[in-house]
């Protein structure tokens, strides 16, 4: 099956000119890797968070969003993840893409310039029109209001 493709404008900022553009690691990858545009390496201590610049500005088309997600290897091997995962980049945002990382391990982790720190997915979005009602006539489901572990372990 052929994947749909959309064109997204991107600009490298001066502190990111030498870094790769976000790219897919494989032909079937859903997300593109984002790179740390740090001037110097930074140590992320346990339970510390850090806003890491990527050195890029993007113009996501209306009707789409950028989803910022952790890289699975960083999370599994080092406990480094995206704090507000998934982060959202709205189509009207025109500032630098920055990644809020947190170290959930008990060991310091060094982030170096050019490290792959997160992934971005460009995904379609819909906007909701609420149907505000006094009488709520939603059909019964097997779950109803059950949540927070109600479906078992």
Swiss-Prot record:
This is Deoxyuridine 5'-triphosphate nucleotidohydrolase. Its cofactor is Mg(2+). Its EC number is 3.6.1.23. GO terms for biological process: dUMP biosynthetic process; dUTP catabolic process. SUPFAM superfamilies: dUTPase-like. Pfam families: dUTPase. The gene is dut. Belongs to the dUTPase family.
